[in-house]
C-alpha cells in the first residue's frame, strides 16, 4: 500500500525541475525520491528485458552475433591498417635515412603499458573461453586456459598477499571480480573431467585429455591417474547395477555392464600400457596415449608445433602482438616427471580392481536376474552378451589386450555370469515344475471328487469313466482324424491320435483331458527352456571345447547344455513323481476306506481307483513332452532303443550301453506302471472278493434243490470193454460236458467286470495276479467244501460219486481256464499247484477207482473241447496259449471246430467265430438231464435281469434253430453244443 502511494505521489511530481524539487523537499526526502526513481527504473528494465527476451530472443542473439562479427571485422581492418602504416614508415625511414643511429626512444613505457593492457584484455576474455571449452567437452583446453589465467595472475601480481594495494586493481576494479570467478574454475574442470571418466561411450583421446587435466590440476602421478580411472569406472558399475529395473531393460543393463568392463580394459591398455623396448607398435592397438598426450601438452616446442593455450581467433586480435613471449608460448608443467607405469604394477592393479568388482557384479547381476521370469529371456540376455563379446573379440584383438594387461584371458561369461544364469535357470525350472505339479494335483483332486459324486448323468465323460464299455462302443466325430482320407499315416503329425486309437487303448476322456492339460503345461515349459539349448540339429551332450569354437566366438554358449538338460530331467522326474506320490496317497486313503466295506464293487471309490490306474498307465504315452523333458531333444525317436534291443538279441548289448537319459525314462515308465498295477490291484482285489463270495456261497449249498439247480448237461457214451473171457461188452457211461452254473456265472461275471473297465488294455501282470488270486480263492472254497462234507449235517445232500465227478470236472475246468501255462513254465511248481493236487486227490478219492480210470480219458476230452468252445466267451480271462488247439495226429474230422469259414459274400456277423456245419454223428448223445438245464442258475451276478445269466443268449439262439434244410451261412451248431 505504501509502495503504491509513493508511486502515485512520484507521478504527480515534476522531476524535470530540480530547483522546484529542492525548494519543496528536504535532503532526506530527496534521497528517498532518488531511491524510488532508481527502483522504478530497475523495475521497468526488468519488465522490458522479460518482454524482449520472450518475444525477440532470436533477434537479440542474431544482433549480438552481428555485433561480434562487426567488432571482429573492425579489429581486422585496424590490424591491416596498422600493418600498412608500419610498413609505410619503414619505407620512408629507409629512403630518407638508411642508417640512422639509434636514439633513445620513448616507446618502452607505452609498450609496457600496451603489454599490461593486452594481458588484462586476455585475462578478461579467458573465462568465456574456458566456459566455451567446457561446453565443448574440451577439458584439456580449459585446463590450459585456467593455468594460463593463474600465470597471468602471478604476472600481474593479482594473487599476491598485498593484492588489494596493487595499482592495477586500483585502476581496474573489475579485475577483483574476475579473480574471484577464476578460483571456481579448478573445481569445475576437475568435476567435469571426473564425470567424463565415468562415461563409457567416450573415445580414448577424450579420456586421455580428461586424465591429463586431472593430473595438471592436482599435480598427480600416472599411478594416481590409473587409480582415479578405475575408481570412476567402479562407480559407473555401481550406478548401472542400481538402476531401476523394467523388464526388457535388464538385458540392456547387463550388456552395458559387460561393455563397460570390456571398454575399461581396452582403454586401460590404450592409456596406460607401454610397449617394451624393441617391440614395434601395432597401429590397430594404440597404447601409451596418456603419456603421449602429457608430453605434447607439457613440453616446450621451439618450432611452435606444440598444443598452446592460445589458439584460434585470439591470435588475430590487434592486442595479441603486445603479449609477452612467456604468455604466447605458455605450456603447463608437472612438478614430477610422468614415468610410465610398469607392466607388473599395471597387472596387479587391474587384477585387484577386477577382484574388487567381482563380488559387486555377481550380487548385482544376481539381483537383476531375479526380474527375468522366463528362460527365453535368459537366453536372450546370454545371446546378447555373446554377440557383444564376439564383436569385441573380433574388432579389438581382445585376447592380445588381456594377455598384455593380465597375462591371462579374462572370461566374463565363465568366471562371472555362467553360474548366475544357471542358478536362475534352476530356480525358474524348479518353480515352473512345482507349479505344474501343484496344478496337476489340484486337477487330480477335482477329477476324483467329480467321479465320487456319482452324478454320471450330468457329465458324459464321468459316465464313460464308470463304465468303459459305453465309451468303447459309442461313436463320436473324433474317432477318425479329419484328414484321414487324404493324409497318410507317415505324413501325420508326430503326436496326432484319433479317437479309435484312444478306444483301442481304453483311455477314457477324463484321462485324455488330464493328460492333455499336463502335456500342454509341459510343452510351454519345454518350449521356454529349449530357447536356452542348442537347436535340434546340434548334438545336445557333445563335449565342446573352446578350441572347437569359431575364431571370433567369445565363449561357448551351449557349454552348459548338458547341465541344463540334467536340470530339466531332474525337475521333470521330480514333478511326475510328485504327481505319482499324490496318486499313491489317494490310493492308500481309498484302500483303507474300502477295506471294511462289503459291497465295494458298487462303491464310487473304485471309479476313482480305475481313473488313477488308467492315468498312470497312459501318462507316458499321452504326454510326449514329458518324455522330451526326460530324454531330451534327440531322445524322442525310438531308434536307439531298437538298436539296443537288436544288440541285446545278438548278445552284444549290455546294460551300461543304454544312455542314462533312456534309463531314467524307463525308470519313470516303470514307476508309472507300478503305480498303475497297484491301483488295478485294489480294483481286482475288490472284484475277486465280491465274486468269490457268491461263488463260495453257491458251492457250499448242500441241500438237494441247490445241487439240482446248479447241475448242467451230461453226455451218455457207449464204450466197449473186453471181459476176462475175451468177449467185448458194450456199456453206457454218463459224464459231465459243462461246468456247473455257478462256475459259468463266476467266469462270465468276471469277464463282464473286466470288460467294463476295458479289459483288452489291462496290464498283463494285473490279469495274471487277478487270475492267481481267483484260483487261490477257488481252491480255498473247495477246501472249505471238503472240510464241511466231513461233518455230517442233517438235511445235507450226501457227496455222491456223480457230484464228486461234477466237482472234479468244475475244478479242473477252472484250473485250465484260470491258469497260465507260460507262467507255470517260468515259475515252476507253485504253492497253488500243490494245493490243487491235494484238492484233486480228495475229490478223486470220492470216486470209484475203476470208474475213474474209465472216465478219465473221456473227461479230459470233454474238458479240452469245452475249453476250446469257451475260449472266445471267456477270452479275457484265458491265456492266449489256451485259445488255440494244439495240432495233434489224433484229430477227429467229425468233431466241430472253431474256425472261420471262407465265404464269397459278406456275412452279417463277420466277427463271430462260426464252426463248420458237420455234426457229431459218431457219438451217441443223450439229453436225459435236459430238464435240469432249463432251470435257471442261482443269481450270482449283481444284476437281477435273467437275460444276463451265462448261456441265456445261446439258449435263445438254439431254441430258434430248426432242422430246415435251407442253406445258411450262420449255423448255430457250435452254439447249441455249448449249451448241451
UniProtKB/Swiss-Prot annotation:
Disulfide bonds: none
Gene Ontology cellular-component annotations: Golgi membrane; Golgi transport complex
Compositional bias ranges of the Polar residues kind: 923-934
Modification type N6-acetyllysine: residues: 598
Bilayer topology term: Peripheral membrane protein
Pfam families documented for this protein: VPS51_Exo84_N
UniProt record, GO biological process: glycosylation; Golgi organization; protein transport; retrograde transport, vesicle recycling within Golgi
Described purpose of this protein according to its UniProt entry: Required for normal Golgi function.
Name of this chain's protein: Conserved oligomeric Golgi complex subunit 1
Source organism (scientific name): Mus musculus
Protein's gene: Cog1
